[in-house]
Design a protein with these regions (language model features):
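Catalytic cores of extracellular degradative/oxidative enzymes
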Residues: 118-119, 127-267
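Alpha-mannosidase-like glycoside hydrolase catalytic domains involved in N-glycan trimming
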Residues: 1-96, 102-127, 141
Length: 267
């Protein structure tokens, strides 16, 4: 998108609120990659809405960004992480991280890393140490409608320390005093990270985005996919059933082949 232009979202001929956070640009200032946030109109159960994106050279009206600290206070944001580390000598060590407190302090002292900032959504990342090698990152998105989404990321990926081994721990993540995610005797391997999402409403939205593939091909945005080639519904159902029966927990291998000596194949 050319530098200086604005992006608008159109539904039934009417512009709807859109926020664009530009992440990378080309040398001439035009947009290469951006994250779009759209305020959708009400959609009936099992309904659908078509959204068209278009450019507009008119300057966007200045609107204040969502105040993350204010939204978190309004929603009484209360997220905590409890980790029980299994030590090599058979003992255990408990650690507790009050995510709400960690995020609030980072917002107040300016150390929170900004990812999105606009009138529809503000997103920040805050990282804290659980142990000397295990870190928790809270990727907190606050939205204008009051919703709060937190991506909790556990990183055991410090490559500059010695004598590390796999880490085994029990985990309990609580939102407003209620357990929303837990694991027992989970082993996290060296140099890995994993994540889980928590919504303030308790349940993730059930929206499903369907892209206009032929149009995207025509613009050169994606390679020329032959959409006449169909995938067997039976194959999709079989793979879905196999995935559900596999280990999809953190550090699980799901349907991946763990043997590295093969020549590789594509189904």
């Amino acid at each position: 998108m050319p530098a200086g232009d604005q992006l608008v979202a159109v539904v039934n001929g009417q512009d709807i609120p859109l926020q664009m956070d530009v992440k990378t640009t080309y040398a001439d200032g035009s947009v290469n990659n951006a994250i779009l946030t759209v305020a959708l109109p009400a959609i009936a159960a099992n309904g659908a809405v078509n959204i068209m994106l278009a450019t507009n050279s008119a300057p966007a009206a200045a609107t204040p960004a969502v105040n993350a600290e204010s939204i978190l206070q309004q929603q009484s944001y209360d997220l905590s992480v409890n980790v029980n580390i299994h030590n090599a000598d058979g003992t255990t060590t408990d650690y507790n991280v009050n995510a709400a407190q960690v995020v609030e302090q980072a917002l107040q002292n300016g150390t929170a890393q900004s990812w999105l900032s606009g009138p529809l959504a503000t997103e920040v990342l805050v990282t804290t140490n659980i142990t000397s090698t295990l870190q928790a990152t809270f990727d907190v998105r606050t939205m204008a409608n009051g919703q709060v989404y937190t991506d909790v990321i556990f990183g055991y990926d410090n490559a500059y320390t010695v004598n590390n081994s796999n880490l085994t721990y029990d985990l309990d993540i609580q939102n407003n005093g209620q357990t929303v995610y837990s694991q027992t005797d989970m082993t996290q391997y060296q140099h890995t990270s994993w994540q889980t999402a928590v919504w303030s409403s308790g349940a993730a939205p059930t929206l499903n985005t369907v892209y206009d593939v032929p149009y995207m091909v025509s613009t050169g945005d994606i390679p020329a996919i032959d959409t006449s080639q169909q995938v067997s519904a039976a194959d999709v159902e079989a793979n879905y059933a196999a995935l559900n029966a596999s280990n999809t927990c953190p550090m699980g291998t799901a349907l991946l082949t763990t043997y590295m000596g093969g020549t590789g194949q594509t189904d």
